[in-house]
Amino acid sequence: LQFCKLDPPQRQTAQTKALETLLLVSQDPNWLIRYAAVVGLEALAKIPQLQQPIQTRFAQILATDTEQAICSSRATGSKTRNRRQTTNRKLKPAFVLLLILFVPLSR
């Protein structure tokens, strides 16, 4: 979404609705849905007013979610990780999600 193209009152309403929706979706039983929500929340976390609830949700996810893809996605954004580890990841999370959804796995 390009929030900057909205008038300030509309922008705040749209950002709040996006945040509420993604926080709800981040609790979905399907890990693919949760992963997509984490990617969306990471994008929204660039907005200072939305950072606190997003950080709180990420802490909950790291403490409770057992799916490695979800926790790895969130850990990639952590400032405590080694810079070399994060720069080795060249694929964007949304692109990885598309690969997971559309590329059949060979077993």
From Swiss-Prot:
Gene Ontology cellular-component terms listed: phycobilisome
UniProt entry tagged with the keyword Secreted: no
Record keyword Lyase present: yes
EC code(s) of this entry: 4.-.-.-
Keyword field: Antenna complex, Lyase, Phycobilisome
Coiled coil regions in record: none
GO molecular function: lyase activity
Function summary: Required for the chromophorylation of the CpcA gene product.
Subunit structure: CpcE and CpcF associate to form a lyase.
Assigned protein family: Belongs to the CpcE/RpcE/PecE family.
Protein name, per record: Phycocyanobilin lyase subunit beta
Gene transcribed to yield this protein: cpcF
